Structures are given as structure tokens and as C-alpha cells.
């Protein structure tokens, strides 16, 4: 089975994940993978690996996030 690299955005609260999900269709909400630590049990996964673009988007949209990591999923 081939694994695909994805970007995981983590959050401190479920409200922040829902906030991002309502502002973009470029990914989806998933449970935090076991290899990632996060304050909230849910995260946002995207196949768009451009971390800088995501950081800029999150800042522009006033979405609070904890971390952005790459994971083979």
C-alpha cells in the first residue's frame, strides 16, 4: 500500500477546527493521527503541502491553530 504525504493542521479546540472547515474546501476534518500531538482530538488534513500558503491563509482568516506537520498517511 502506497502512503501519501499530507499536511495536518492541529488545534487546541474543536471550535477552531470547525472554523477552518467552514472557510475552506481544500481538506477535511479528521481525528488526530497517533503520530501527532495536539490539544484537541480533531485535526484538519489537506493534500496541499504548501505550509507557507496555509499559514498565510490561517492568519488572514483569523483561524487559531496549534501546529502544521507533514505526515505519511
Predicted regions and their residues:
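Positively charged, small/polar-rich N-terminal and surface patches that mediate targeting and assembly
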Residues: 1-73
Amino acid at each position: 500500500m502506497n502512503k501519501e504525504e499530507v499536511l495536518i493542521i492541529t488545534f487546541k479546540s474543536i471550535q477552531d477546527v470547525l472554523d477552518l472547515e467552514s472557510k475552506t474546501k481544500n481538506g477535511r476534518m479528521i481525528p488526530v493521527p497517533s503520530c501527532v500531538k495536539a490539544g484537541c482530538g480533531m485535526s484538519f488534513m489537506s493534500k496541499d503541502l504548501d505550509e507557507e500558503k496555509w499559514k498565510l491563509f490561517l492568519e488572514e482568516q483569523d483561524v487559531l491553530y496549534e501546529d502544521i506537520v507533514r505526515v505519511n498517511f
